[in-house]
């Protein structure tokens, strides 16, 4: 490849073509150097295709709703959902309306993908879709859609209507003010929790080209990171936010629906979904009916229910992402967010100027007084029609709180810090902007508030330790219960003397897990219930000791059972921490596990953890849970799982430090765009 690229360079550079360098470090992470942002995007497209071409092409098919024509009938319903929301149509219609700079970046990115496909036709699957730059717009819409769709689904559920399930999304994010850190600069933790497989499997990348200088995680098939940092600031997001979407109860009769005093015709369209059957592609027609509120998604008791999403005709997400990627200060970041293109999220921004900032972001409709958007609203009366979109200034937000820290692990703004000034009463006129209560924090958030509130002179190493902490919330309450019920039990003393960390090498942590599961429903509780008897505790201890010594042996530890490794691989490694719902155990480090043989192997949770010290320039550390490449022979298929993630470590990014990067370069490619 290098020889081909150099030949191209010698032939073409005289005509003003741009040279792009792709330097890969010892973990296969691409560091792309170009003269322009478009050149960097070209390199990004090439590198992503080199590592995960098939997954990228699947992402485009998912967004368009054309999976079934390539992979069969099991994807028909998924395709229907994407057709329902018109991702392809909106993207095709409005691509021309994007900022020319964004169009140039999209086109350069796909040119890079096409270049790789041209040079490596043996890697191009027969089902590969034709590449078009508008697919990046469709993919952006597809990626954010689960959040507003989930809000509307919640409205339907509260009316007793079971909507189609929407995937769970969770995350951690933290910010420390300069006065709490050893470097006297803010520290950010960017820690999304999603599936380790599929469209949310992030791609790690560093990009340098023109005004684009960024490190972070991007969705495969998009040109630059959405989570990470540039030279001036960091950006993190977690699930949670204002109520952005609604359901309406509609009166429908004979292909018409009532609105005020008239019966309007339903908007009816037919989507033709290709379905692979053997060697053929057959077509299934699906009928989609909509009112002016949105598509009809459910029926019950003679009523139809439409879903109204304010992002339905939006297409400028990439523009907002670009504005964040190139922002130079907090004011620039706020202007980018004010475009209201991002889904409902808790967004945190830290800057090299020393700012820490939070906004409960989203595109939020203005609802009339007296209407309850938490349930389906009447569609026929006209009394609950949207009255525009709330401006960015209306959203819940705070800059530089006196506490000197913030965290949001999918919690209410009230639970982000001790004595939080962000209380729901301040938004009582429009409670859907706050969209939460003074509810107590979940275990992850409660632990992090305690840790951050006590933090002083925090180093990068200490912040990495916090991000990967395996401390089990309220384990001390169970230890006290064990002491009370079985003060003479030697095995009970092992658990009672445990340091309450689910470290991979801890036998007591594994024993605690088995003890909690032996308690049945009581063990799934975070705190010991009053109804738990001493006899039940002693019985669970006896069962646990027998299981631990009999089924697992004297050397078994937490990491004997809880492992990390890639699906389809032949090896796994012990890992610390995780969210063990069946035992009521949670740690700041989030990992969810599935049984694989006799092991519990991670499948979701921390997907691209970043620790960013906002010095000038920033210093950062990052890890993904598996590996950068989908090519098993590359050496980067599961190397981060083995060498970093299983050891609760993150590697330096060498951001804006090419001299140091050069010491770690393992491959070097030159391309021409």
Regions found by a protein language model. Give the residues of each.
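C-terminal/peripheral segments of proteins
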Residues: 17-480, 500-673
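Hydrophobic h-region of N-terminal signal peptides that target proteins for export
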Residues: 5-16
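Large, well-folded core regions of big proteins
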Residues: 480-489, 493-496
């Amino acid at each position: 490849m290098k020889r081909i690229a150099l030949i191209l360079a010698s032939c073409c550079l005289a005509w003003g073509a741009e040279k792009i360098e792709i330097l890969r470090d010892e973990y296969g992470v691409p560091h792309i150097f170009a003269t322009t942002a478009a050149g960097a995007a070209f390199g990004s497209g090439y590198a992503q295709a080199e590592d995960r071409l098939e997954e990228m092409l699947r992402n485009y098919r998912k967004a368009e709703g054309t999976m079934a024509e390539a992979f069969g009938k099991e994807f028909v319903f998924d395709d229907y959902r994407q057709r329902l929301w018109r991702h392809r149509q909106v993207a095709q219609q409005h691509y021309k309306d994007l900022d020319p700079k964004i169009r140039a970046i999209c086109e350069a990115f796909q040119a890079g993908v096409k270049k790789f496909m041209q040079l490596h036709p043996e890697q191009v699957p027969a089902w590969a879709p034709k590449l078009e730059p508008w697919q990046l717009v469709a993919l952006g819409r597809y990626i954010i859609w689960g959040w507003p769709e989930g809000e509307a689904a919640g409205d339907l559920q509260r009316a007793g209507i079971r909507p189609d399930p929407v995937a769970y999304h969770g995350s951690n994010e933290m910010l420390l003010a300069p006065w709490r850190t050893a470097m006297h600069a803010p520290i950010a933790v960017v820690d999304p929790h999603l599936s380790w497989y599929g469209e949310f499997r992030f791609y790690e990348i560093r990009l340098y080209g023109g005004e684009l200088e960024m490190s972070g995680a991007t969705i495969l098939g998009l040109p630059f990171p959405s989570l990470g940092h540039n030279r001036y600031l960091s950006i993190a997001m977690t699930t949670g936010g204002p109520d952005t979407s609604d359901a309406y109860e509609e009166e429908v009769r004979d292909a018409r629906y009532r609105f005020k005093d008239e019966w309007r015709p339903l908007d009816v369209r037919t989507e033709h979904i290709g379905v692979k059957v053997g060697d053929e592609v057959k077509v299934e027609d699906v009928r989609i009916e909509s009112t002016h509120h949105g598509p009809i998604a459910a029926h019950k008791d003679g009523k139809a229910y439409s879903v109204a999403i304010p992002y339905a005709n939006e297409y400028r997400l990439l523009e907002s992402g670009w504005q964040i990627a190139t922002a130079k200060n907090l004011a620039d970041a706020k202007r980018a967010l004010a475009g209201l293109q991002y889904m409902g999220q808790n967004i945190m921004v830290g800057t090299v100027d020393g700012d820490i900032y939070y906004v409960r972001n989203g595109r939020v409709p203005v609802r009339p007084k007296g209407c309850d958007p938490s349930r389906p609203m009447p569609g026929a009366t006209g009394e609950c029609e949207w009255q525009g979109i709330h401006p960015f200034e209306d959203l819940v937000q705070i800059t530089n709180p006196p506490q000197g820290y913030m965290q949001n692990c999918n919690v209410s703004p009230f639970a982000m810090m001790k004595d939080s000034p962000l209380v729901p009463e301040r938004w009582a006129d429009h409670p859907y902007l706050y969209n939460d209560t003074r509810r107590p924090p979940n275990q992850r958030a409660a632990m992090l508030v305690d840790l951050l509130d006590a933090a002083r002179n925090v180093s990068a190493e200490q912040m990495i330790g916090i991000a990967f902490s395996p401390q089990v919330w309220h384990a001390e309450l169970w230890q006290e219960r064990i002491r009370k019920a079985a003060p003479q039990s030697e095995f009970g003393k092992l658990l009672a003397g445990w340091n309450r960390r689910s470290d991979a090498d801890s036998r007591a942590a594994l024993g605690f897990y088995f003890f909690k599961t032996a308690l049945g429903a009581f063990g799934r509780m975070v705190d010991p219930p009053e109804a738990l008897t001493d006899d039940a505790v002693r019985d669970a201890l006896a069962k646990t000791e027998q299981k631990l010594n009999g089924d697992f042996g004297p050397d078994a530890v937490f990491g004997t059972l809880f492992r990390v490794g890639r699906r389809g691989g032949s090896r796994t490694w012990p890992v610390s921490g995780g969210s063990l719902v069946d035992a009521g155990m949670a740690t700041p480090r989030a990992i969810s596990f599935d049984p694989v043989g006799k092991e519990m192997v991670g499948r979701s949770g921390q997907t691209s953890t970043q620790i960013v010290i906002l010095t000038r320039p920033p210093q950062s550390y990052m890890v993904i849970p598996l590996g950068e490449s989908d090519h098993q022979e590359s050496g980067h298929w599961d190397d981060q799982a083995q060498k970093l993630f299983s050891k609760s470590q993150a590697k330096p990014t060498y951001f804006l430090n090419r001299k140091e990067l050069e010491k770690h370069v393992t491959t070097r490619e030159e391309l021409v765009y």
